[in-house]
């Protein structure tokens, strides 16, 4: 991961980065994020305003954490400037989603509607009854919430019914062969 870790991180205008020991705080137009880095990794500000992630030695653990830490800090900067968004689609007869305030209510073939409460920092938007978006500034949280929603009714391989990411290709199976 050292090739990724060696790259410097550009800090755009309007983003304030505070480094306090192992804790990195990033504040931007969309919000504020903070992350505590693993022990051997340090972040320092270069003269040109960019951030550099450094490791003290070439031990295996330090090498593993070097690229990871650089990517996490870079994702925080992208999150507070642009944000992250995952789009999900619903396929199936009678399957749909509706917005109930900040939360989502799904009709997915169960005997009851399933309600998903929006965690702090996550916003839901429903474009169509079969297409909705999960958005936020924390990439990990956006992906986790989207994965938990998909887990409610994952797409099945025979008809493709269920909740899937937009653009996801579902491997289909042939149905059982009829009698001859």
From Swiss-Prot:
One of its GO terms (molecular function) is structural constituent of ribosome. This protein binds to the 23S rRNA, and is important in its secondary structure. It is located near the subunit interface in the base of the L7/L12 stalk, and near the tRNA binding site of the peptidyltransferase center. Belongs to the universal ribosomal protein uL6 family. This is Large ribosomal subunit protein uL6. GO terms for cellular component: cytosolic large ribosomal subunit. Keywords: Ribonucleoprotein, Ribosomal protein, RNA-binding, rRNA-binding. Part of the 50S ribosomal subunit. NCBIfam families: L6_bact.
């Amino acid at each position: 991961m050292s090739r990724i870790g060696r790259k410097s991180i550009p800090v755009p205008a309007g983003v304030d980065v505070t480094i306090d020991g192992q804790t990195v705080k990033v504040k931007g137009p969309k919000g504020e994020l903070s992350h505590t880095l693993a022990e051997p990794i340090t972040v320092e500000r270069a003269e040109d305003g960019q951030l550099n992630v450094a490791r003290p030695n070439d031990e295996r653990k330090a090498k593993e954490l070097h690229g990871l830490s650089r990517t996490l800090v870079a994702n925080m900067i992208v999150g507070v400037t642009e944000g992250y968004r995952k789009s999900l689609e619903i396929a199936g007869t009678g399957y749909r989603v509706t917005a109930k305030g900040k939360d989502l209510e799904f009709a997915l073939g169960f005997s009851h509607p399933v309600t998903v409460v929006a965690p702090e920092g996550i916003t839901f938007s429903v474009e169509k009854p079969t297409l909705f978006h999960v958005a936020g500034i924390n990439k990990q949280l956006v992906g986790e919430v989207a994965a938990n929603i998909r887990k409610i009714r994952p797409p099945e391989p025979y008809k493709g019914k269920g909740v899937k990411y937009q653009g996801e290709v579902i491997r289909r199976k042939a149905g059982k062969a009829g009698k001859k």
